[in-house]
Amino acid sequence: MTHIAVIGAGITGITTAYSLASRGFQVSVFDRNRYAAMETSFANGGQLSASNAEVWTRWGTIFKGLKWMLDPNAPLLVNPKPSWHKLSWMAEFMGNIPNYEANTIATAKMAIEARKHLLRFAGEVGFEFDMEKRGILHVYKSKGEFEHARRVNELLTKAGLDRREVSADEVQKIEPALKTETLGGYYTESDFTGDIHRYAGALSKGCEALGTVFHYKVNVSDYEHTDEGVKLTWTSGTDKHDQIFDGIVVCAGVGSKAIASALGDRVNIYPVKGYSITVNLDDEASQKAAPWVSLLDDEAKVVTSRLGKNRFRIAGTAEFNGYNLDIRDNRIKPLQTWCETFFPDVSTEHCVPWAGLRPMLPSMVPKVGPGKKPGVFYNTGHGHLGWTLSAATAEATADFVEAARIKNAA
C-alpha cells in the first residue's frame, strides 16, 4: 500500500497528506476548489483551543436549541423544518449524552497532542501563519455559564490541560482592551491562534515538495472498491479520468457522508453552519482598540483572534439548516454588535463576512481510522475543532495506513 488518494484539501486533508508523504507514501489529493482550504478552512475563528474541547452532547444544549428555535439572532439556531437526516442525527446526538464526560476528556487530550504536531509541521516546512501565542481567555457575564465552566474545567484538568480561573480584575489585566464588565473567566496560556487558510496553503506547498500531487477543480464522480484497490473516477473540465489507488482517506468535511455511503460505510455527518467576520483594522484607533489575546464568550458562542496588525477575526454561532452556505445578515449582525459591545473603539465599517459548514458527528468526536473495506480510511467529522484536532488525527490516520501497509507486506 504505497499510493494513497486523499479526498479533500481542507485542513484535515492537507495535514493528512503531509503526514502520509512524510512517511514515504505517494499521495494524490483531490478537491473541487482551485486552491487548498477554500471552504470550511477558509475563515474560521482561528483558535487552536484545547480549552474549547467540551463536546455539546448534554441536555443543556437540547433545551437551548428548543428555546432559541424561533429566535433568528440566537447563538444556536435550528431550522424547524424536518428532514430524515436531521432527525436521525439529533436522535444519535441525544444517544451520546451519556458519553459527554468521556468524550470531552478524550477530545481535550487529542487537542493537547495536536499542538506539537501542528507546530512541528510548520517548523519542518518553514512558514509563518500569523500565530499569536498569547493564550485563550474565556469570559463570563452569566453566573450560570460561569458555574458550568467550573464543572467543565474539572474534565479538562483530567485531560491534562492547565486552565486557571481568573477574577474580573485579572481578566482586565490579561486583555486591557476589553471594554465590558465580566464576572471573571478562565485563562489557558498554552492555547494559541493563527490564520488557518494561510497555514493550510503553506503546508500544501510542503506536501508538493515531498512529491504530493494535487488535483484541483475536479469532481470525483465514482468510488469503486476492487480487488486491486480503490478506483476513483473524476472529471477535470471536459476530461474524464480514472485510476486505482492502494488506499483512500476521506477528509471531505460535510461531503464525507455521501462518499462513505458509496464505499459501504455510514458516517452520519451533519453540516452545522458557522459565521465569521474579518474586521479590517484600517485606522490606528481600531488597531490599538482590538485585542491581541484570543477571547471566547461562552454565552454568546463567539470567539476572536487577532491575525496580525491589520485583521481581527470574530466568529461564532451554530446553525442547523442543511447544506446551505447563504450568508444571512441577521446572523452577521450579532457578531458586529458583539464587537461594538466588547470593543466599542474598533470600527466594523470594513469587515468581510463569511460562512462555512462544520462537519459534525452526533458524538462530537471525529471518525479516524479504517472503514469496512480494505484500503478505506477516514479522517473526518471534526466539527468546530477541525484545526485544533487536525494534526493529531492526521498522524493517527497515517498510523492506521502504515499498519495496513505492514500487514499487507507480511
Where do the model's predicted regions map?
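C-terminal lid/capping helical subdomain adjacent to the catalytic/cofactor pocket in oxidative enzymes
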Residues: 165, 187, 226, 281, ...
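A conserved short coil-to-beta-strand element within the FAD-binding core of flavoproteins
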Residues: 166-170, 174, 216-230
